[in-house]
């Protein structure tokens, strides 16, 4: 029954006192969904805004790759507002993300799944799941992931509703990476090259992609004055 599934998942997410946080979500989610790892990506417009949490180093890399390259399961799930399933990244007949797939495979990722986070008409991002072996999610795992995405979206909205305008709720920041360094670096490049911040972000992404680096690492070099674009 749907209600039983919801109660079971909420109970697993709870800390025993009726509350839970993003860190516990990404800790418990892989066990519930039967996968190796999970991550929650929040979006800003049609672009990745940052990760709310990740369950392990590989999940963190998946989020970083999507943020750097602008493609991947979370981005498609959000933009298309539907579940995205790629059960075998190594299958040459079904290459969906030409930039994302090679480094993901090198990290040991064989299957990825994206579930949109939304409450009514409000879209927030996507829940990302990955496996180190090929194959689709089972029917029960898929149903559990849908509930996880729904519960996560509602929790994010409810938590942020209690924060002041323009301020991220502290409960959302605990395990998050909102890539503040990238925004700082974009500001620096904007001043150095006399361009808009938007154009600076585009150049940072292009440099990261062209040099096979993560955007966060490039940003840190710009901030430390080890790198100047232009």
Where are these regions (language model features)?
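Signal-transducing coiled-coil/dimerization helices and immediately adjacent hinge/linker segments
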Residues: 161-229
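Allosteric cytosolic regulatory segments
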Residues: 142-153
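Short hydrophobic/aromatic beta-strand element in the GNAT-like acyltransferase core
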Residues: 101, 114, 126
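Short hydrophobic beta-strand micro-motif common in sensory/regulatory domains
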Residues: 111-118
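Regulatory sensory and allosteric helical modules in signal-transduction proteins
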Residues: 43, 59-96, 105-110
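Intrinsically disordered, low-complexity terminal regulatory regions
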Residues: 1-69, 221-230
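Short beta-strand-to-loop transition segments that serve as allosteric relay/switch motifs
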Residues: 89, 126-135, 140
